[in-house]
Amino acid sequence: MTISKERKEEVISEHGAAAGDTGSPEVQIAILTERINGLTEHMRTHRKDYASRRGLLGLVSRRRRLLDYVRGQDPQRYLDIIGKLGIRK
């Protein structure tokens, strides 16, 4: 599922270093997390929607790669991101 433009701007302002910061890994991970949460809710009611399931797996995979990149660059930043977004353990 897509997220609204307003919600996307909120996420960018919350996680970005500057107002227009859309490229930093933190912002990208936060936006992907919002989209993943929306699709997860969709999948709870539409269990047999296999096309959406495939899209969800792709988003999770993309987020995983970004998280791996951040963990390799700066482990403390990685821990901050997963703590702030409430993902992982």
Swiss-Prot record:
It comes from Rhodopirellula baltica (strain DSM 10527 / NCIMB 13988 / SH1). One of the primary rRNA binding proteins, it binds directly to 16S rRNA where it helps nucleate assembly of the platform of the 30S subunit by binding and bridging several RNA helices of the 16S rRNA. Transmembrane segments: none annotated. Keywords: Ribonucleoprotein, Ribosomal protein, RNA-binding, rRNA-binding. One of its GO terms (molecular function) is rRNA binding. The keyword Transcription does not apply. InterPro entries: Ribosomal_uS15, Ribosomal_uS15_bac-type, uS15_NS1_RNA-bd_sf. Belongs to the universal ribosomal protein uS15 family. This is Small ribosomal subunit protein uS15. GO terms for cellular component: cytosolic small ribosomal subunit.
